[in-house]
Structures are given as C-alpha cells and as structure tokens.
From Swiss-Prot:
PANTHER family associated with the record: UPF0173 METAL-DEPENDENT HYDROLASE MJ1163, UPF0173 METAL-DEPENDENT HYDROLASE MJ1163-RELATED
Ranges that cross the membrane: none
Entry protein name: UPF0173 metal-dependent hydrolase Acid345_3437
Pfam families cross-referenced by the UniProt entry: Lactamase_B_2
Annotated family: Belongs to the UPF0173 family.
Length: 233
C-alpha cells in the first residue's frame, strides 16, 4: 500500500509515532520509558506536535505528563482524563468525546468507541479516567488510519468502515486484556481496511496472540507485521 508520504513507526506495544507529509509528529499512547518493547534509541522522544491518548492504563498513558511538559504538544483525550492531566500541570489539553472531530494542523482527528476500562493509577489510588476510546485519523493526502486502542471486536466497527473507511487499522491481538487474533480478524471483516498493523502483543507473557495466528484468520486484507522501531513509509 502506498502511504503517500506518511511515515508510521511502531515503538512497541500500542505506541506509535506517525509523521505526516507536512512534518507533523503524532505520538499515540505515549509509553516509552518503561516499555520493554521500545528500542533504547526511541526512549527519548525528540519531537511531538500532537499526542493522542486512548485510555488511562499505565501502558498507554505512561509518559504522557513528562513528554507533554517537555514538548508542549496538543494533547487529545477524553474530558475526564484531560482534567487529570491538567491537575498534573499539562497544558494545551484538547478534550473531546466519542463521535467528535477536531482538526489539528493537517490531520482530522475523530474519537471513536472502544470496549475497555480506563482507570488511571495515581499513587495508591485508581482515578476515574472516563471511557476508553480509539481514534480515526484522516490526513491531507487522503490516507485514513484507525488506532483501535485496547478493545474487543464490536459491531459498531462497521460504522467506522461506513463513515471513514480507514485503509490502515492498528488492532490489538494479544488476548487476555484485549481481543485475540481470531477476534481481530473478525474486526477486519467489519472494518475492511487494506492493511492491519497488529499491536499490543508479546510485551508481557500473558499477551500470547501472534501476528502469524492473525494471518491464518484474515482474508480481507494484508497483515503488515512490524518490529519495534521499524518505520513503514
């Protein structure tokens, strides 16, 4: 598939850096320092213009506060999480909710549904972080990308296909905390992308799903397996 100047780098687990043809740097689910799958060369984030957070679990919100304070990106998240981030001193929080779209530079960001929990661990407490979500990103070059966040397959993925028609779907496959490869293949049937990037697998022993298993089930599109630190462009 031709990404038309878009660059997608997998930093391990559910963390991605996406660079648009105009040079906008997007960081999705910023967990790098404690992420055992993230290459050492990527643990120091050098630039980020837009940060997207799908939910409040440590392996997704991870380094959001530190990176946001250092680079001052626009931080897109659900309102309850935004309130928590602002209490931690994060500025430029761009709250939104499911179904909403906001334009950030050369990207149209739409927040969509995910089926997962969203508590934020804050010291010895778990703080309500709103609901988990996914994002649809439509770029100026007409490429559309869907990051599902942590989720199981759900029937409204068909709506995501019908309204936005993402060509690329980043789908969790690890099982236990998210869907497994078989469910991810069913999600692909609903979404009808051109390519799936499998994520959220292998980081911990309990995340047993494998891209090779996904390939056995998927019939509607390619499975674009990436290695942590690899860039698809």
């Amino acid at each position: 598939m031709d990404l038309q100047g878009l660059k997608i780098t997998w930093l391990g687990h559910a963390t991605f850096r996406v660079v648009t043809p105009k040079g906008t740097h997007i960081l999705i689910d910023p967990w790098v320092m404690g992420n055992p799958a993230c290459p050492e060369t990527e643990k120091q984030v050098k630039k980020v213009d837009v940060m997207l957070i799908t939910h409040g679990h440590f392996d997704h919100i991870g380094d959001a506060v530190e990176i946001a304070k250092k680079h001052s990106p626009k931080v897109v998240c659900i309102p309850e999480m935004g309130a928590w981030l602002q209490k931690k001193g994060v500025k430029n929080v761009a709250e939104m909710n499911k179904g909403g779209t906001q334009h950030v530079g050369d990207i149209a960001v739409t927040m969509v549904h995910a089926v997962h929990s969203c508590g934020i661990t804050d010291g010895d407490q778990v703080v309500y972080g709103g609901e988990a979500c996914g994002y649809v990103l439509k770029f100026d070059n007409d490429v559309t990308l869907y990051h599902a966040g942590d989720t199981m397959a759900f029937s409204d993925m068909k709506i995501i296909h019908e309204l936005w028609r993402p060509q690329i779907a980043m789908l969790p496959i690890g099982d236990h905390y998210t869907m497994d490869p078989r469910q991810a293949a069913y999600a692909a049937e609903l979404l009808q992308p051109k390519a799936i990037i499998p994520m959220h697998f292998g980081t911990f022993p309990v995340l047993t799903g494998k891209p090779s298993e996904l390939e056995k089930f998927v019939e509607v599109c390619d499975v674009h397996e990436m290695k942590p630190g690899e860039t698809w462009s």
